[in-house]
């Protein structure tokens, strides 16, 4: 029964707090007589000043930490302290400066009445119909400003003043994968792949490096420095300045790798409503397979996949361009090869929008034998009226190469959109001497809303055999005279077609693609076609794919490959939460038919553990393969492992990935990170989860790294209140940050570490401390609360024993102060509350 009485008291305190803080709607001012709540000891005895509560939402004047909104749109990255004072009506009025109003989009220049000569606080009454609404219970300050008094800007534009360059820090991103394969009667194959991405942030500057290491027992060890660069944003130009290794944009010319400098537009700095690209790799594995992605001979990505369809959507930008070569190494040692086009195309620009790039430096080839010739390049794309876009550029490498490009794009309304451009080149290469030629390119895109059809056609035609790109020309200047065939062959025609057809909710969707290429110097050509169908039946998904590839070699010999695959996925949530079963079959010419059965799922509340088991009957070999895989996303990194076994072979894979962030407050370990990240600072709050990020939680000091943020956009970093410990309170669980590209932004949270204590305070005569008195931890006004009826007060963040300071009175010479020493004791039950009784004297 005692426990019941205790809970009722606690509930009454909460109800009392809610009554004081609840919003009220009325046609007349509400009033209550504070005398009804006063407890007098006799004539002349001091009483608690409750006059501030006589009006609706009444609160004492002073500093309040609030979220600030303008016209119900949040304009501050996080809560901030604002001084409130009483106006003539007895209501609280905020002190905001002219600079702050201007920062938040108010047209202060048109309203000189805002300025007050003897105060830094702006006079909101200087704008007709403007007013401030302080919602105490939500700690929200909303400034209602007429639209005519606001500066014009896009609805989704984030003011530059809110962009956060982040904190100084050292970074190290690492990813290591090891793979072992044992074949009956053959030597065991072992390989290890490691990539390291160290970095340094100081103010707006970002220093980055990408280094890889490969080792196998067959080919030895090899280190490669893929790139190093120094970068910063130039806000006034909405651009990025890059010094070091990178690649020129591919919107007008083919992308060219360089070591030097580049100034280029960064469209991410623009609002979404007025403004980029890395391909998604898709394929089908017949067994537990190792997927390796190479670009220009470098390994840029490696991972292990389970049998069936896979998708790689986290391929990092390598700072280079060129088609991606994808190798799928199956458990039986066989390999599949895919080629994924990797190039971006010019896009139509809004009227008046200009995008540019200026690049200069050494041609950065992907092997040590190519000479480092100097070149410069400039491109520009400008949006003209009536839906036209004009674009062009120049390239110059002295007497070795010059080219000029000019193109136009047009939005042709219901007919779609097209672009056409031409490049004229003059080249001096070591294999063919001086030549000149032209390249023409036409593209067309159209959405048929009535039929749900979207298709894009892109065609390249090298109209003369004398045309060469900058990379093809400078690539012939080599110390070994061994010019690669991809430079000497010179593509003549390349055509691409992609089509997506929505068949409606009841019938699924179709997609198709076609790529054709041929060359001037030999009979080599290729033709690839793909057709896919997808459909969901009440959460059961099916897919059917057909691909056809024909490659003709240097002397006309053709190889052809046909692959047909079918897959069905069935959720098993009724039996096992977050689990699904899959069956897939693949028929490939030359490899027969394989069948695969999989069971996959995730575990824990935040789905931080992914697991899978599978069984495969592989192709013509009729090898039976069984295996499994597991991946665990922890706060300090990610671990993964896989194992498969057949009659003649075994495969074992394992890996670890993560990042180390060294900052002014210490060292924080995390999962692998993206380009732009956040650092949670919640001092002393250990084990607090971060919403929407599996496995991320604060360390023993209260720090955690949020691995992915969007630059130049509002990002909410929200802590999971369900993971709060009984001895931890956090005032605000969500912070809003606006990072610049590559920044590490800090999201600070106000924490109170200690016990929640329900305390009964009495005076030496045994009477309770008066209702409405303010109680706080001695020498700390952070832990403060209002005393309720019977001298009871609920405080959080208290040590087990300490001293409270209690004040009451009307502030007119009748204020009473006393101190109360206490020792708290844990309550029975699972409420997490502690109790204490103390005499205030």
Predicted regions and their residues:
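Post-signal-peptide, soluble extracytosolic/periplasmic N-terminal scaffold domains
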Residues: 2-5, 11-16, 26-277, 588-661
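Transmembrane beta-strands of outer-membrane beta-barrel pores
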Residues: 149, 178-182, 204, 213-217, ...
